[in-house]
Amino acid sequence: MSWLQKLKQGLSKTSNKISESLVTVFVKKKLDQETLDELEELLISSDLGVHTSHHIITKLAKHKFNQEVTIDEIKSDLAQILIEILQPANKPINITTKPHVILVCGVNGNGKTTTIGKLAAKFAKDGHRITMAACDTFRAAAIGQLKVWADRVKAEFISGPENSDPASIAFKAIDAAKENNSDIVLIDTAGRLHNKTNLMEELSKIVRIIKKQDQDAPHETILVIDATTGQNAISQLETFHKFINITGIIITKLDGTAKAGIVVSLVQKFKIPIYAIGVGEHLDDLNEFNPEDFSRGLLGL
């Protein structure tokens, strides 16, 4: 199955919901105010958020108000508006320095460690030498999981005893990367609730210690977001960004939700790059974000 097919399949819960609702909304062919209001409610219920949904409807009304339209025409117009909104997110990770330090964070249970493993596999496939740092020292299972990925992609693996200081492991990993001539350092951190200040401050400490090795590092700080959390993802990103400079996001579990509209809401609000999206457990279920493919998939086109 191609990535495009996987993406459409992964977004089917959201696209089916939107398509079924559009049939209900468009009992009339004319795009009048009542129909626009119903369409706006539909977008909000798909987790595009109030502000984003209103923006989309305003643009749609500007071109098509009181005109006769088909459902397919509306889908096509909506897709074009979404593509425009999502363009700021269309930025891949560029490996510009050596070692290029990538810090990955997120709340508990969002698929963070698996995502790091998949990133490592993709970087290795591109010929990069990798060092992986297990800074989630609170869970032996997380260390073990990352070690499996490191072995699989033949990466240098740096860890410490359970409950050891995560910042010191990050520091050691960058040291090791310089010694073994790694191109990339991938740093896994413990999942943390964004409303726990002490854990968020620990993340700030990791960043401060990393900067002792390289003032410009981390070169990327990625927040992994579980799409099934819907609008809660906005408060996650806001809070993490207060403590550390989030440079981009990766959105996982899009296949498990009818809330994939949150992707649009996040980009509209933060204008932040989406480095990748995930639609399943397998290695090739994570891929670079493409605004056009995503927008068309979201609308079942």
Language model feature labels by segment:
Residues L11, D47-G49, V107, D136, ...:
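Residue-level signature of catalytic and energy-coupling elements of molecular machines
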Residues A190-R192:
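Short glycine-rich anion-binding loops that position phosphate/pyrophosphate groups of nucleotides
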Residues K17-C135, A142-N163, S168-I187:
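Primarily NTPase-proximal linker/entry elements flanking Walker-type ATP/GTP-binding cores
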Residues V50-T52, R139, D255, L283:
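Short hydrophobic/aromatic residue motifs in ordered secondary structure
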Residues M1-S19:
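N-terminal accessory targeting/assembly segments
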Residues S12, V27, I44, F65, ...:
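Alpha-solenoid HEAT/Armadillo repeat architecture
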Residues Q145, D165-N180, H194-G300:
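Conserved catalytic-core segment of NTP-binding enzymes
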